[in-house]
Amino acid sequence: MTKARASAPEPAHEQPAARVRMSVRAVRTRVAALRRRRPVLTVLALILACVIALVLVDVIALSSRLERFDIAAPAPAPGPQTPGAGAAPAETWLIIGTDSRADAPAGPDRYGTAAEAGDGERADVIALLQPRPDGLTVLVIPRDLTIGPSFFERRRLAASYLSGPQSTVDLLCSELGVTTTHLITVDMAQFARIVDAAGGVDVEVDEPVRDESSGLDLPQAGAQHLSGIDALALVRSRHPQVRRDGEWVALSEEEGAARRSHYTGVVMRAVMTGLREQSRSPLTAHSLAWALTGNLGVDSSTGLTGLVGLARTVLGTGADSVEVVDVPAPVVNNTFVAYPTPQTYAVLARYGYVPGRCRPAGAQAGPGRAG
């Protein structure tokens, strides 16, 4: 009898491929057997596999649309015991709207050209979002708030962003005790597109108002349905005129700053309401997610999971459960400077922000746009 010759061992680099081929054959055999015994179950399994694959591809695509910033997050510190201070929030989302004119809606001229505005981006809108088990708190901080470790080192929050988002995060931490856990940025054009994606916003204005510098023109008081461009003009209005007794009256710098903070909160609440309404349809919700991820910047440690968690809070919160707080800080003598007052610190402390409760991460990281 002729003795069978032993086959030569397969090369090491081919062994994984061989195992894959064996696995594929095994899967085919099992699927074929399942098809014979459970044809309906087989079809459902294939459909589910396709759906999972599509969802994963969609998640990757959505994540890739976000602009990323490298931010060194501050750390909480024990801090001093302050009477009336609330507990430090579990999460603080820092929302910054910038004044970038690079892609200004309806043409740059309406908002001033980049050359007229100067180099860099300033923080035009600054808000702190605190998700709560029973709702959401939004604290609107005046962009003119001027803070620092000494008189000669004070900076306006708006101007701190010229050195990059890290500078703003660290300044809020060291001087106000704000421990930022997540950062979201949006420029003027992005803000307008988000409002339009939400179907516009419904707001109430107490008197006719206009502002040539921001393009605001609301000739009638009462309920208003605003497009993205008009909502942007409202939250950016700094030198408004209101019509009283048939005449247009210019408001003071202090009144203009107070109205700006107020309507920032009003519009943010209205945007949340609009997003909630638009998200009721799965198809519209997907389109909305696509629009949002393409118009937001986030810190590099915030992924889609964190954004989805925030979205669930926003979309699951009724308008009555959204608390909007205007942090007080009056401007000085019709200037662009507002120093914190005892009332400023008291309001912030009520929501868990106390100087000394936050430790900055370290050296400033500059603009820090991630690749």
Regions found by a protein language model. Give the residues of each.
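Non-catalytic, solvent-exposed segments at the cell envelope interface
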Residues: 2-371
